[in-house]
Amino acid sequence: MSDINDIANRPTRMLEAGLLFGVAIDAIRVIKVEPRTGGQRSALVSVVFSVIALESFVNEMTEHAQNMSSIQLAEVGVFAQMMGDAEEDRASLDFRLRLAHWILTGRMMDRGSQPYQDFALLIGLRNDLVHTKPNRLYTYGKTTNEEAHSRLMKRFRDKNILAEENSASWTHLVQTRAVAEWSCRSVARVVNEVCSGTSQSDLQKTLTFVNQMFQSYIAGIF
């Protein structure tokens, strides 16, 4: 009984990453049309909140490692120090994620393969939404998506997730259920990549718990 009381009275930290990822997943559920039908605004929620959840995951794991006792594996101390330094230096989410992967798994994340490529593409899309630039001039019935949105079309050509209809608005093209699903899958895969292959430690237990939340959300929607 004393052990139970000790656990009950022990300070705990509520982790937000899973909850935020749930927001991205819930936004998928409300889209009831064909996967590549454009103009589904909830898809933008999935794009933005999937990345927010990923950044929350990185920040919370850094803070969690920093609050651990010194009686931990050396890699936990290295993770806490280097990830904390990267955050103080305002390093990009891309860099911090690759740094976390290297420290925890002992392997560099392959930037030329999945899941990194989709992750990088997603970060770029989120940034384009947050820092939206004007659309190009568009003549209805004449201008094609390739002409009006050449950069977007080139980046996503092989994904087959953009809206299939022509549109003067580039954001209309990414407002599809297919884009929303791809965003959440990409984040869940990169979280799994970071959490897999870590050594046994208290940090690893937390990583496993958080990873299971992300993967269970994915399993529940697909």
Language model feature labels by segment:
Residues A24-A27, L121-D128, G141-I221:
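Amphipathic, Lys/Arg-enriched alpha-helical patches that create a basic surface
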Residues A27-R36, A65, K133-R136, V194:
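Secondary-structure edge/capping motif, primarily at the C-terminal ends of alpha-helices
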Residues M1-L44, V48, Q212-I221:
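Charged alpha-helical initiation segments
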Residues Q66-L162, N166:
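Flexible secondary-structure boundary motifs
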Residues Q40-A65:
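Short, hydrophobic, well-ordered secondary-structure elements
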Residues R13, L20, S50, P115-D118, ...:
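Amphipathic alpha-helix face/heptad-repeat signature
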Residues R29-K32, E55, T62, A188:
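Alpha-helical repeat scaffolds in large eukaryotic proteins
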